[in-house]
Amino acid sequence: MSIISTRLNSIKPSPTLAVVKKTLELKKAGVNIIALGAGEPDFDTPDNIKEVAITSIKDGFTKYTNVDGIPLLKQAIKNKFKRENNIDYELDEIIVSTGGKQVIYNLFMASLDKGDEVIIPVPYWVSYPDMVALSTGTPIFVNCGIENNFKLTVEALERSITDKTKWLIINSPSNPTGAGYNCKELENIAKTLRKYPNVNIMSDDIYEHITFDDFKFYTLAQIAPDLKERIFTVNGVSKAYSMTGWRIGYGAGSKALIKAMTVIQSQSTSNPCSISQMAAIEALNGTQDYIKPNALNFQKKRDLALSILEKVIYFECYKPEGAFYLFVKCDKIFGTKTKSGKIIANSNHFSEYLLEEAKVAVVPGVAFGLDGYFRISYATSMQELKEACIRIKQACNTL
């Protein structure tokens, strides 16, 4: 009898973290690799947030807290939802967890039974399907390629709904594409969902504050307050405040769901880090002056990367509304032969080719459910980004 559970047979380690690990190994070996695989901002956590954390340590705020988050932080989250999204939540409709990933994991563990279906638009953040599967649910994939601007249409949504559908996932702006749903698109989705009262919606808003040009962010509970009891909104401090390592995410939904998720959390991690919670209060309540400049900085990087990569004859690029990724269509390159005689047959092969030939680490599209694409993160310096994109272009020109 194996010591490893059969539950893990269909679960894969995070492919993005695998790319990061391989990149670090090559760098350690002295290879001049430019890493465009990581999904985290390249600026540091702001000083005012760090200072609150340091003070919290010195003041001895180092003990257990409420499992679902300290009331002061939940109040800051409640105020954030009202201030920025015009949504009213009570404190017992909010949970704080060890990152947005744990919020989502708790959500599915608390709500899914065997055979319950979760509609996942493709491409997707790599962890959605595996978290659904670990919770005994069934992922239902809906292709939303570049021809649909990487967004779910109401026609595709209706075709995917069955009497077993329990959740629909909406991620806007999206990882890996940066595509964002505008107000009208969300209204159309809400209109469709009103016909299906068995379907709940998880809105993953983690990239809310990284948007570009004239795109205006909306979240579904703001657009459709009548569906609020069926909507679970996920957010956190990782992206907007560059606090990926602090591990604070939060979610808001019905009291019954929050209570069930708190039970799950009480038997796994218990409370999130006490010091990180105090830092998150400062992130939400303190100055927001750096958020817009940081988004503008990412916009410049997006434009730089696009200006180089869209000139590659093999590529088709989508101009993202937010986040810090490009999800580039590259299937025209499939079937070509490298100088060493290898055939590039899929996105894994192409990513390996870029790593070997261009010394640039990217994530293959198959990791996000769509072969024929690759993802770059432009959360790096302008100099490194420009050099990496030039290397990619040159590597493609030699094929």
Curated annotation (Swiss-Prot):
The modification N6-(pyridoxal phosphate)lysine is found at residue 239. It is found in: Cytoplasm. GO terms for biological process: amino acid metabolic process; biosynthetic process. Keywords: Aminotransferase, Cytoplasm, Pyridoxal phosphate, Transferase. Its main location: cytoplasm. Belongs to the class-I pyridoxal-phosphate-dependent aminotransferase family. This is Probable aspartate/prephenate aminotransferase. It comes from Rickettsia typhi (strain ATCC VR-144 / Wilmington). The lineage of its organism: Bacteria, Pseudomonadati, Pseudomonadota, Alphaproteobacteria, Rickettsiales.
